[in-house]
């Protein structure tokens, strides 16, 4: 189970249902394949390094990647493919999760007049923290 699966399991994901996840894990092709969204997904992947660089410049924190799949030591079914890590001034490490969105989804990042992380992304960050045993996760959204 990867971090993006958590919001589908909790029923908070606007992108996939628990049934989609079930079919995905069994390698069963989904009846309604989301081919129309491939451009947005590809742009998100292409923009990740730029967004990480923006975060690094704005915060002054060192940002780096470890390209591997992390696995929880006690629960091997818990996996995490972390976008980036952040070296904080006190020497500790945090997670940096990169998100890209569009103008129509901007309201998902606000609640009661305050900037917030959507619950479906928050669950992803919490999953990453559980797998990596880190206690801080930054989200940077473009």
List where the protein language model places each region.
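Charged, glycine-rich intrinsically disordered N-terminal tails and low-complexity linkers that flank
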Residues: 1-46
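Nucleic-acid nuclease catalytic cores
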Residues: 41, 57-82, 87-142
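A generic secondary-structure signal marking the coil-to-beta-strand transition
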Residues: 18-20, 51, 92-94
